[in-house]
Amino acid sequence: MKKGADTMNTIKKIKNIYPLSHMQEGMLFHSFLRKEEGAYVEQSLFTIKGSLSYDWFQRSIQAIIDRHDIFRTVFLPHVPHLSGPRQVVMTEREFHLNSEDISHLPTNDQNEYIERFKEKDKQKGFDLQKDMLMRISLFKTAKDEHVCIWSHHHILMDGWCLGIVMQEFMQIYQSIHAGKPLSLDPVRPYSTYISWLTNRDKEKAAAYWDTYLKNYSAPSPLPRVSDKETKESYHREDLIFSLNKPLTDKLKETAKQHGVTLATLIQAVWGVMLQQYNRTDDVVFGAVVSGRPSEIPGVEQMIGLFINTIPIRIKTHQDETFHELLIRCQKEMLEAEPFTCQPLFDIQANTALKQELIDHIIVFENYPLQQKIADSADQTDSPLQIDQVQVSEQSGYNFNLVVAPGEELVIKFSYNAFVYDAAWISCIKRQFTQALSTAAQHPHMPIADFSFLDATEKEQIVTQFNNTKTEYPKNHTIIDLFREQAEKTPDHTALVYGNMSISYKELDKRSNALARELIQKGFRKNETAGILAAHSPEFMISVLAVLKAGGAYLPLDAELPPERVSFMLEETQAKMLIVQKGLEQNAAFSGTCIISDAQGLMEENDIPINISSSPDDLAYIMYTSGSTGRPKGVMITNRNVVSLVRNSNYTSASGDDRFIMTGSISFDAVTFEMFGALLNGASLHIIDKSTMLTPDRFGAYLLENDITVLFLTTALFNQLAQVRADMFRGLHTLYVGGEALSPALMNAVRHACPDLALHNIYGPTENTTFSTFFEMKRDYAGPIPIGKPISNSTAYILDTKGRLLPIGVPGELCVGGDGVAKGYLNRVDLTNAVFSPHPFLPGERIYRTGDLARWLPDGNLEYISRIDRQMKIRGKRIEPAEIEARLLEMEGVQEAAVTLREKDGEAQLYTHYVGDHKKTDTDFRADLARVLPDYMIPQHWVRVERMPLTGNGKIDRSALPIPENKPAKRQNIILPRNLVEEELANIWKQVLGVNTISIDDDFFAIGGHSLRALQVIHTLKHQQNIDIPIDFLFEHPTIAQLAEKLYSKQLTAANEQHVIKLNQHGAQNLFCFPPISGFGIYFKDLALLLNEKAAVYGFHFIEQDTRIEQYVNCMTDIQPEGPYVLLGYSAGGNLAFEVAQAMERKGLEVSDFIIVDAYLKEQPLPIDTGNDESAAYLPEAVREKVMKKKRNYQEYWAQLLNEGHIKASIHFIEAGIHPETSGHTGLTKWEGACGNYSEYTGFGAHKDMLEGTYAEKNADIILDILEKITSNQVILHKR
């Protein structure tokens, strides 16, 4: 390296050349690699009081430089004839002191000046190949007072050395001051240590650390309770605190009694805390060791870079006490002592975690710098006093725990403020203090009982975080409150469904009528009635009717498999089944059936029912997935529901609001939607599934109906927000929940809808729908909290023994309060297992959710994951065990394992099974669909020869093979036969993530579901401008069926509408006339390319003789006034010329007419009777209609003559490629038939100009013309 060689040549005398330590090599490498100024620059700032001589100061520092080789060293990445980098010790280096008098400045200005200098000095950095790697600056701030800034490169020495250097400085300065000769013991150079390091047994050290870290595979970081981005930089903050003397003494005494060092005790305590933060019994963190091997004589006075970071592993065993852990940790530390010089990089490289092995470090300052300086001053009777020492070191870790001994232990948390926030660091401080106290007071405590929750934090969690009591009508039933509302606002709209609007008074009467019918047919108080319905007014009327009759309702979604419906009716012993009119064929019930018809309920039966109910009576039974293979019926009372929707902190619903029902009637969110509206005087809109799953239609409905409050499952929200983030802008409150939220999408919606109150909502069915809420008021990069308990609910994080856990420690989220359900129907064992006595309020109960969560310091909760195998799919809670149980009931399945995996950002179910070779995945899906709802049907099926097992004989789910992203080989794949089928196949492949699709594949049998269907609908709209309701895909689930339906739909539109709008909007309208194929859809590619530049309307060929008049009327309907811009391609150019003449005769202004490769038609031509190959690519059902339109167009065009003149400007785009046999040169262009004329040479042959490869290039020409039209420029020359 030339620079290194030049440096060598400038050195007159070299004392020594030797290799670098591993840590020095790393710093050298990164200093050249990163190049940012200030890297590895360490700074110390301290105050010097006394009469200071600059000359004596400089002489003292120069003496230190002369004494220690390391201060005269430069570092070269390459030295000729030597391998590897080297440190070169010069015989002499001259030191220059920088000094400045700022005593004239006010104190605040002095401080600011010094801070600016520090930063500037740090940014200056060092050139390792030539600089003296140490700078010292003195600032006089007052008489006999200076501030010293001492900067050095970390490659020279570690922080442990600074105390040695400062001690020597005080001794040397005192000698000069006293005029006495210097008497310091000689020191050994740093090269002595490098020699020792080179000769040690590295393989033996590596083997030790490999054994020490064996089987450690999961990182154990200090949790980051912060949502700050870490990419900005490293902004260091420090939290420094002391342990009082009694606690410090007790810790020292405990360590001594158990025969361990204080460092070992503190490391053990920290390790146990880290275990609880990570829910594990095995953690690793880093510890900084001095790195000074005792076998080197005089090593304690050497100056250089000795420190090293080693891993500390704290692994605890069942029933182990803290005392036993201490003894084992001390033993391990002694065993590790000979190997503490092994480079951390080498240790990490041999582990599975590599750089993730260590997340943070602990540093023990066994002899603090301040104490060394003080001792030195006392010993020498120095004229100078040094205090207020500040050492600025920055490790590569985001958190450092530094412990300094003394009468009171001083602890410093040095952390990156871009990663950890101050509130969480303060919380750790309190918990660490409590943990140390617990260890000192109870060293024989079992680790399993070790807690660092102090009384203050317990009070904070139990009282402050759960201060949720509000007044609400807890002694009223749902019907009490509904009747109050109906009397208060009888004419206010209660329900809206399509064109039907039902007032509170009407709803009250209709539900009275149905309730009376129930009673007349034998329904009694406290019995259960099933309601089989879809989204409809009938469902809402039926719910109120059952409650008025004193019973509990069982919601049964019409889409549930009949077997599941039958099971629920049987287990609940339902006495009656109310069936929505039109769904009678779905009802398989031996009891009494009542048909519910919102239109047909007679008012003569609407006399109120006077059956008294209690708030503790059941309101409904709702089923969730069960681990035993059968679903669980959750029993919800009237009070549960009332507490959810009345006077609660998460909602301000009133009579001015309009809610909308989006969830399945068997999904618990419908409870909030129904009663949140009707018990607060609001209106409830009920929409069909098709509208809800079509983003444009759903967004339009929200705006047109001024919907104010909406709940969406996370999965549905994600799909809708991806299409249009601003579709919720008319709402004032949006609740999203069911699964973890996407921060990116939530951020996007928040920005697109600035007036929207956007909530993350959480809650299990067993706690009546909602338990916690969090309003998102800023952007999030990481997990969005689930918030705080709703009113009259409580939340606790408990361990497996039911004990309260501290802030930041994950545990089971348990919820209490007035929303807790009665339990599970007919499942006493399961009820007792998860509905437990309240740990703090005698006589009350909590529900153990099975969810893992933790408290954040601000009182919000953060959801982490499920504890058990329960999962969430599209907002619905499922038990894999239930699916597995059903699979094992099926013929051909011997073993089955169901798992959840993330694929393309979506949670998907995978089934691995041992079973029949003959049955296909489609067969198994079909069998499962008969007994389970669609969201519980796995998308991916993998047949295995045998299940992988764990050591204890259980299925090893982590070892199940991940299937390749391709379907199994099939015998009869039918490929697309026409363009529409081909486009549909491409969209399906994209949405389903598969490579091969047959046009007879059922979308829902090969991994599709309602939300993926929504993606297909959106993609069709976006790519092809084809807008279809989602019902189309449910009714026509194969590509062949859907393609035929689309052709028929387009053909019907062509026959009825004559024009199709092909893109969203643009600065001006462009009316396009079709080629001989006869359909305006031909211009779809052009429309996509011109979107937002021009609104493209494609005309179809009109077969009636009044076509010209109809075209003119269509255009004036769309655009009442001119000027108009027309485009005609091929035969459409001739047709459009006739239309332009007719418009001008009517006095309409046609400013411009773009003709794409059509020539003036001056004589009739024979009709082309040749075979039309395109007919073969059309679906059979529409082939004849399409070809008929084309033949009629051919006949019209063959006889058409373009005569006369138009005032409009003509822009003629001619094909760039002409067949040699076309006779092109004899055709007449349009110069003599218009006002202004311009000509352009296009791209491609005639048939390719507006499709495929050349469409974009020719669209650019058209766009250029449109822009010039807009700016009223007329091109008068041929281009």
Curated annotation (Swiss-Prot):
Pfam families: AMP-binding, AMP-binding_C, Condensation, PP-binding, Thioesterase. It comes from the Bacteria. SMART domains: PKS_PP, PKS_TE. Transmembrane segments: none annotated. Keywords: Antibiotic biosynthesis, Multifunctional enzyme, Phosphopantetheine, Phosphoprotein, Transferase. Its cofactor is pantetheine 4'-phosphate. Residues 14-1047 are annotated as: Domain (isoleucine-activating). GO terms for molecular function: phosphopantetheine binding; transferase activity. Its EC number is 2.3.1.-. GO terms for cellular component: cytoplasm; cytosol. Residues 503-898 are annotated as: Adenylation. The modification O-(pantetheine 4'-phosphoryl)serine is found at residue 1010. Binds 1 phosphopantetheine covalently. Residues 1068-1273 are annotated as: Thioesterase. Belongs to the ATP-dependent AMP-binding enzyme family. This protein is a multifunctional enzyme, able to activate and polymerize the amino acid Ile as part of the biosynthesis of the lipopeptide antibiotic plipastatin. The activation sites for this amino acid consist of individual domains. This is Plipastatin synthase subunit E. It comes from Bacillus subtilis (strain 168).
